[in-house]
């Protein structure tokens, strides 16, 4: 074999150059977690599908955790991608998978077990674990009273860890963990007497108790605890440091407190306020807006009294109302809906009524052509309240149960299931406060019945404002008991509630 005289020197130089190149390459630092997020332009977050964390309503994506983490993504200048976990164990499993979500935002409590699964941020919300029971049953007053009770909590939750610690001290305490339910399901089970007790955090109870009148707090189990976000343990500190800086900032500038007030502060509920109050508002408020209701309803081919009933349910005919969630005006329109309907000033009563009428007509027109009146009107009201996607989920549930998806009486039985994990986990649009549209439609029908009665031909126009107007069952000098309001019976063409 023949070799060129200069081969070995050249080979040596090549090897040296290659080695230096590899060494330099090894010295190049990998991008940090924060840098990767910014380069990808996406922040992947995993959460729970529940009222206190993340869900969709007629306004779109919402929830305390969602709004807080959405602001964080906006601060980073990236898109937010929300993923929902099947349960708490699944949440941590997904975070720890290669290429999984980089952030967990689901009202998480830092526990000894979870410290092995994730690293936690600064706190942003203080909550108290509470034992809840059904009103009318014997009230537990301390952990010893948990013996002999059927207790169910979320699988993998901090509450399950608390009960495990109690059981170590008092072996007679028994409890079950379930990954097939959410907090709302547990409260419903207590409310209906299916289980004796459960543990929930104070914020989630405050948000949901209005829907479960039989649920009561027995006692606080331990001291207040702090909710935090979580990042995978294998990541560097860059994202966690950025999160902590963000949480500190929103704490100082008041953003965090405003979110707390919106979701956990006192919420005014516009339910059935009583026939007496309604009669007073018929005289004092409706005459100012009656022509606007009639004009807009005629244009959109809607009964003006139905439109007025919607307006009363939404704002009690108050044009300057603004809710904590940002809906405004007599018809309580969202900013997006107002823009879509051509409303430039939501606080202008005429524009608000026009926008509400146009939007209701649009929603009604989107329904399946097979749906006939009067069910078409009631289902349109439900869609107006909860959103078309969730209504379709309820209709599909009705169909699967052998019920008629085109009948309000059947669909309204399915709507509350959208708040139960057993059912919403099978739907396209997920969790929704399904009980709300049922009450929304029921209230509007009550108001509509009264409006129909008082606006018979002999009571048209300005006579509605007559001081001698009488609503059946109402003594104008003595308001009726709010627990038993009397309203006219539904007319024959309207199906009974």
Curated annotation (Swiss-Prot):
Assigned EC number: 4.2.2.n1
Pfam families in the cross-refs: SBP_bac_3, SLT
Reactions catalysed: Exolytic cleavage of the (1->4)-beta-glycosidic linkage between N-acetylmuramic acid (MurNAc) and N-acetylglucosamine (GlcNAc) residues in peptidoglycan, from either the reducing or the non-reducing ends of the peptidoglycan chains, with concomitant formation of a 1,6-anhydrobond in the MurNAc residue
Signal peptide bounds: 1-29
Region (LT domain): 268-497
GO terms, molecular function: peptidoglycan lytic transglycosylase activity
A GO cellular component annotation in the UniProt record: cell outer membrane
Alphabetical UniProt keywords: Cell outer membrane, Cell wall biogenesis/degradation, Lyase, Membrane, Signal
Ranges where the record places region Non-LT domain: 30-267
Region (Disordered): 464-497
NCBIfam families xref list: PRK10859.1 (NF008112)
Annotated domain remarks: The N-terminal domain does not have lytic activity and probably modulates enzymatic activity. The C-terminal domain is the catalytic active domain.
Name under which the protein is recorded: Membrane-bound lytic murein transglycosylase F
Organism of this sequence: Pseudomonas syringae pv. tomato (strain ATCC BAA-871 / DC3000)
